[in-house]
Amino acid sequence: MLQGILETVPSDLKDPISLWFKQDRNPKTIEEVTALCKKSDWNELHKRFDSRIQFGTAGLRSQMQAGFSRMNTLVVIQASQGLATYVRQQFPDNLVAVVGHDHRFHSKEFARATAAAFLLKGFKVHYLNPDHEFVHTPLVPFAVDKLKASVGVMITASHNPKMDNGYKVYYSNGCQIIPPHDHAISDSIDANLEPWANVWDFDDVLNKALKQGKLMYSREEMLKLYLEEVSKNLVEINPLKLEVKAKPWFVYTPMHGVGFDIFSTIVKKTLCLVEGKDYLCVPEQQNPDPSFPTVGFPNPEEKGALDIGINLAEKHDIDLLVANDPDADRFSVAVKDMQSGEWRQLTGNEIGFLFAFYEYQKYKSMDKEFQHVHPLAMLNSTVSSQMIKKMAEIEGFHYEDTLTGFKWIGNRAILLEKKGYYVPFGFEEAIGYMFPAMEHDKDGISASIVFLQAYCKWKIDHNLDPLNVLENGFKKYGVFKEYNGYYVVPNPTVTKDIFDYIRNVYTPEGASYPSSIGEEIEVLYYRDLTTGYQSDTINHKPTLPVDPTSQMITVSARPSNGSENEHIRFTIRGSGTEPKLKVYIEACANEEQRASFLAKLTWNVLRREWFRPDEMNIVTKF
């Protein structure tokens, strides 16, 4: 039958499709490819077979479909074989792996296939998902740390749409992988594409390993330890002080994800908060549901994603909503403005400042000897707000920025800790918050615990809500306002063309960078991490890692007609996984209206001078 099908396949597709039929043993994906061949849907087959899904620092992520460029059981097996082989070479005396999964379609199957590959390579596997249980993503890096494993894999696509899934990798230090490991793992995957003997029989492999003591179901052990670590490291307020009102005082939504069970358990056992009495959970979004029925895009940042929760809060006269994304590694907040009566969802940068301010307050109350031995340090990604940099300058603590992603934030935090710094917090503007006392990756559950305490402390001790605290921060450190968005590009070559235009056409001949952008913006600082140039360093070498394969430029500037204390900073970069050119703009001024104006002005000037959407056929999105 297959031979007859292959006879109809175009020559440039015949080899990869033949290989697929040879290697795949999943009846559903075999039938999927067969059906596409019978329909002669060569365009779709080219999309799925012309290239192989690339393993990067975020692991793998794509739609769940048949094909070498998609997420499916065969691709997961191949990735796991390559990863297990590489890690075995790096840690031959510590063959211990952690595997977990969320509630998405096929997550359990992918996780079991992953565990089987590691078991066949001689690893002991701590499997976090007995039966039909789910775990939140932060439990995997936490377990890697506590179990001293050499690698961890979490099957999740975080807040992506329902048709997606992913394969997230943590290295032996509990952080996401960074170069050169990502490239080496990718090479190892390419060298281990042929499925190993018995790897497709993953249920049998797991059952045999369980009897031999090589497969351990470690979910309950790790959850117990996670709870203990939250209590020890993150809880500092007397739970009795959380009796803010005699009725529920906040709403929680897990966004159809895995968050509710772990959230409700943690807040009850550490903060004595009980659902129904102290808070309400959005009933329509409470249970894990991989179809995400109430939201098309299950990301708390998306417009309208929190509407159901806000409506519930309004109904019960509640003025605080906290949210996790589906795998509970991100955290978001909406608060009711008591002056206007309108609800306001805080940006990732605003929440980041509130956490940083709270952690700074805690640090200042610590023992002076501890402060002397362990100076304070906080960090965020280079596309995130510079407000904590300003706070660090004024308050006298150490601040650093990193490349985008917690793979960089987490690894840098570890290095700072080794130097003796106390690093309580790091963040990224995409609602990701890291508390290194728990793990060196973002954690939405830890963020929830810390934020609820901060909220109560400010409310009870100072009669301030988060908006008041933010306003006080603006008064002391300057008003910081962002204007972020992206352009949808038709293909990666357009992104390169735009950056080449900036470097080679817009920049005057003989200059390293443009001194101005239009008549409105005066450039003060310029960094190009693609070419390896930074304007304010010796020999103009960047302080952050250079990557010639990705496009990224950061500019600090001032408005040409502005005052000395007005400042603009923006980063433009090409997305490594999506057809997007991302733009992150932040302006600082004395007044909120002026800062917002400068941020939007910068967007418009860049649009006109650099991006030229009509000419380049790119579309604006926010």
From Swiss-Prot:
Organism, as annotated: Saccharomyces cerevisiae (strain ATCC 204508 / S288c) (Baker's yeast)
Lineage of the species this protein comes from: Eukaryota, Fungi, Dikarya, Ascomycota, Saccharomycotina
Name of the protein: Phosphoribomutase
Gene3D superfamilies attached to this UniProt entry: Alpha-D-Glucose-1,6-Bisphosphate, subunit A, domain 3, Alpha-D-phosphohexomutase, C-terminal domain
Gene Ontology terms for molecular function: magnesium ion binding; phosphopentomutase activity
Cofactor dependency: Mg(2+)
Presence of the UniProt keyword Metal-binding in the record: yes
Positions contributing to Mg(2+) binding: S158, D325, D327, D329
InterPro entries per the UniProt record, alphabetical: A-D-PHexomutase_a/b/a-I (IPR005844), A-D-PHexomutase_a/b/a-I/II/III (IPR016055), A-D-PHexomutase_a/b/a-II (IPR005845), A-D-PHexomutase_a/b/a-III (IPR005846), A-D-PHexomutase_C_sf (IPR036900), A-D-PHexomutase_CS (IPR016066)
Cellular component terms (Gene Ontology): cytoplasm; nucleus
Phenotype of null mutants: Hyperaccumulates ribose 1-phosphate and upstream purines upon glucose-induced purine nucleoside recycling.
Keyword tags: Carbohydrate metabolism, Cytoplasm, Glucose metabolism, Isomerase, Magnesium, Metal-binding, Nucleus, Phosphoprotein
